[in-house]
Amino acid sequence: MHPRFQTAFAQLADNLQSALAPILADHHFPAMLTAEQVSTLKNTAGLDEDALAFALLPLAAACARTDLSHFNVGAIARGVSGNWYFGANMEFLGATMQQTVHAEQSAISHAWLRGEKGLAAVTVNYTPCGHCRQFMNELNSGLDLRIHLPGRAPHTLRDYLPDAFGPKDLEIKTLLMDEQDHGFTLTGDTLTQAAITAANKSHMPYSHSPSGVALECKDGRIFTGSYAENAAFNPTLPPLQGALNLLSLNGYNYADIQRAILAEKGDAALIQWDATAATLKALGCHNIDRVLLG
């Protein structure tokens, strides 16, 4: 078990500990539960779906990287597939505050990058900030997305974001988590192709500036992130943050990164290169390349 989970794990009910122990035994537990695992945990612990999600929130919060605020937020995105995806907030010392990943963004991006097609609910241990409410409004689940908070009755995003502004106001039909493939040809080595594949998945209906990042760890593991734009612009999640989020959720550290590649168009309206390189260098990675999408 990764050390970050030990304190939260020790506070779980005994029957839930017994059921979770083999799942968490992998040091690189992927911070997600399959629908089958969720069903097993519900039956073993005697909990309904909502109660189980609340019980697991401390494990999600344990994934937080909060070197600045020391305020850990955990979230669980519940996919329509039945799979659950952990998320936690991330802060990056030496970068800018704008590079921060919020817990809800973390869980949602996690689900999206693992191929989830939509979300039924998000469970989080603190009320979503306005930034995250706006980020969630980009999803194909729309304002019907259920939000669960400890000690409160469940509500929909519509309740938390009244009179919402979103993609429909800009006549955008393809939403975040809808399947997208922008068709750029895969070239280069494995890491380069992974970055291009991530760029092909981008949600960028406002700038039409696709981008993707691939990070290679010293053990050969590759994590990718795709660009996710938002109708309100500022809640947009850059591709590097998506990749760093997956890397961290899987129990890796920034020092494990040995190489990074950004894929983007050289003539795009928005360019990720400077911000991507600056953040990676702040985290200790200097082997950074860029491939231009044709």
Curated annotation (Swiss-Prot):
Is Hydrolase found in the keyword set? yes
What residues does the CMP/dCMP-type deaminase domain cover?
Answer: 48-168, 186-294
> What's the protein here called?
Cytidine deaminase
UniProt keyword list: Hydrolase, Metal-binding, Zinc
Which residues bind substrate per the record? Answer: 89-91
Question: Where does the chain bind Zn(2+)?
Answer: 102, 129, 132
**Known CDD domains for this protein?**
cytidine_deaminase
Pfam families (UniProt xref)? dCMP_cyt_deam_1, dCMP_cyt_deam_2
Q: Which family does it belong to?
A: Belongs to the cytidine and deoxycytidylate deaminase family.
Write out the catalytic residues in the record. 104
User: Which catalysed reactions does the entry list for this protein?
Assistant: cytidine + H2O + H(+) = uridine + NH4(+); 2'-deoxycytidine + H2O + H(+) = 2'-deoxyuridine + NH4(+)
Give the Gene Ontology MF terms in alphabetical order: cytidine deaminase activity; identical protein binding; zinc ion binding
Q: Name one GO cellular component term.
A: cytosol
Q: EC annotation?
A: 3.5.4.5
Q: Which organism is it from?
A: Salmonella agona (strain SL483)
User: How the protein assembles, per its UniProt entry?
Assistant: Homodimer.
- What is the role of this chain? This enzyme scavenges exogenous and endogenous cytidine and 2'-deoxycytidine for UMP synthesis.
Originating gene: cdd
* Cofactor: binding comment: Binds 1 zinc ion.
Q: Which GO terms describe its biological process?
A: cytidine deamination
The cofactors named for this UniProt entry are: Zn(2+)
InterPro entries for this protein: APOBEC/CMP_deaminase_Zn-bd, CMP_dCMP_dom, Cyd/dCyd_deaminase_Zn-bd, Cyt/Deoxycyt_deaminase, Cyt_deam_dimer, Cytidine_deaminase-like, Cytidine_deaminase_bacteria
Keyword Nucleus in the entry? The reply is no
What the entry lists under SUPFAM superfamilies is as follows: Cytidine deaminase-like
